[in-house]
Design a protein with these regions (language model features):
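N-terminal helix-turn-helix/winged-helix DNA-binding helices
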Residues: 29-62, 77
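Short conserved active-site loop signatures built around small residues
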Residues: 24
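Short histidine/acidic/glycine/proline-rich micro-motifs that form metal-
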Residues: 10-13, 57-60, 87, 174-180
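Short beta->alpha connector loops
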Residues: 87-90, 112-117, 249
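Bacterial carbohydrate/catabolite-sensing allosteric modules
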Residues: 29-35, 72-80, 95-102, 108, ...
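DNA major-groove recognition helix of helix-turn-helix
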Residues: 8, 28
Length: 282
């Protein structure tokens, strides 16, 4: 029994054969063993003052701006932040959740994008404070700061219509039930064009499949989505006169593809994005 305990706790001052160690680990996995969370006495005090920030990645200034603001405000109240970039990988998110439940005594979690494990996170919110920042989701049972995707999309549509555009293309990262903001922006664009009397084909949509998306560099996921899809559209030919990126990073990719193919903005095409990150003013 003591040998099992030492192997499971990864003691370094003892020696066991690889076969013995593997048998213990396999048995623990089969039985669903989980390392017990440290007691309050065992946990160093500073950990209880840490706020975990779950974000998809830090290459998009939208998220880094939020992280900076949250961290600055947390410091005002004596808290520190721990940023967990998941690259939108569910297994990475699960790792952080398990780490928090089993090893870290955190003060709370702030989600900057939709979790892939909503039932589990809903349950965790009964034990610690959790806040979500994003589109409204009635299935969330914890605190949420709602960020509308529909309203800015309507503003974009109204602006493009006022400039004389009658057909546009919306370019997005993969559309999914979890990432609702992507489809909400498209739906709002279509609805606004229809309200002005334009047909069903007024707004076309192009997005990468999850498989294509996963092949891209994690540091350039959104930018590369905009860049690759715009080049495909232009090579195929299009009657759209404007491109709308799901966010500013996608829009940057659209711009670079247009410039590379010698198109001028706004003379040949108009380009819009969302989020209003600082780089968008350059």
């Amino acid at each position: 029994q003591s040998a099992v305990s030492m192997i499971l706790n990864n003691k370094t001052n003892v020696s066991f054969s690889d076969s013995t160690r593997q048998k213990v680990l396999d048995a623990a996995k089969e039985l669903g063993y989980q390392k017990k969370k440290k007691s309050i006495e065992q946990t160093s005090k500073p950990l209880s003052k840490i706020i975990l920030i779950m974000c998809p990645f830090l290459s998009n200034h939208y998220y880094t701006t939020l992280v900076h603001s949250i961290t600055e405000r947390a410091h005002d109240y004596g808290y520190l932040t721990f940023v967990a970039p998941t690259l939108r990988n569910p297994s990475t998110e699960q790792y952080y959740l398990d780490l928090m439940k089993n090893d870290l005594d955190t003060a709370g979690i702030v989600y900057l994008y939709p979790t892939s494990f909503l039932p589990e996170v809903n349950d965790m919110s009964k034990q610690i404070p959790i806040v979500n920042i994003g589109d409204k989701n009635d299935e969330i049972t914890f605190d949420s700061i709602h960020v509308s995707s529909s309203k800015p999309a309507r503003l974009v549509a109204e602006h493009l219509i006022s400039l004389g555009h009658r057909k546009i293309t919306y370019i997005s990262t993969p559309i999914s039930d979890i990432e609702r903001s992507r489809s909400k922006r498209y739906d709002a664009l279509v609805a606004t064009f229809k309200e002005h009397g334009f047909g069903d084909d007024c707004v076309s949509i192009r997005s990468l499949s999850p498989g294509e998306y996963n092949l891209l560099s994690p540091n350039m996921l959104e930018y590369s989505s905009g860049y690759n899809l715009t080049k495909q559209i232009l090579e195929e030919g299009t009657d759209s006169t404007a491109f709308v990126g799901y966010n500013d990073m996608v829009a940057f990719g659209i711009l670079d593809a247009l410039y590379e193919l010698k198109y001028k903005v706004p003379n040949d095409f108009s380009v819009c994005g969302f989020d209003n990150i600082p780089m968008a003013d350059m």
